[in-house]
């Protein structure tokens, strides 16, 4: 399926297919994907190839176009995603780099536009809380940024 925006990826889960391929997704904002079950393969406009099986947390940086293939493994494909605005990512970066040097984030600029991390205890619940609050606007901006920092700390 040829598409343009990331909203198509979220709604594609309702199509209930064993495999799904979406071409030309433009990431205007960074995206955090919680892959619970299934397998995902992503090719980016910069030539990176990413493959992961659930449970896995996947971060994709903004300003790139991706081609994504998702398929069932032993269970039905199950994933959710959250778009992250630039201000939240910048706040998290500054928090880890300047306020908590014990995280020792590297000072070199990353060469990839993606990150992968296994889903640890509590991460899925925090992701689900943030995902549902984005729809219902229940949480304050401060609480959302705290939860985003928690999720992004999985990649350190």
Predicted features, each with a name:
Residues 2-105:
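N-terminal regulatory/effector-sensing and dimerization cores
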Residues 109-156:
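An amphipathic alpha-helical interaction segment
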Residues 1-5, 153-156:
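Short intrinsically disordered, low-complexity coil segments enriched in acidic
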């Amino acid at each position: 399926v040829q598409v343009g925006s990331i909203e198509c990826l979220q709604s594609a889960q309702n199509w209930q297919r064993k495999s799904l391929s979406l071409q030309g997704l433009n990431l205007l904002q960074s995206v955090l994907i919680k892959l619970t079950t299934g397998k995902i393969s992503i090719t980016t406009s910069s030539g990176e190839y990413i493959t992961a099986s659930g449970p896995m947390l996947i971060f994709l940086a903004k300003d790139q176009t991706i081609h994504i293939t998702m398929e069932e493994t032993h269970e039905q494909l199950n994933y959710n995603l959250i778009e992250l605005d630039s201000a939240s990512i910048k706040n998290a970066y500054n928090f880890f780099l300047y306020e908590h040097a014990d995280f020792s984030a590297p000072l070199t600029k990353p060469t990839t536009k993606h990150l992968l991390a296994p889903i640890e205890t509590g991460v899925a619940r925090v992701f689900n809380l943030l995902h549902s609050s984005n729809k219902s606007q229940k949480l304050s901006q401060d609480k959302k940024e705290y939860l985003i920092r928690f999720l992004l700390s999985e990649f350190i």
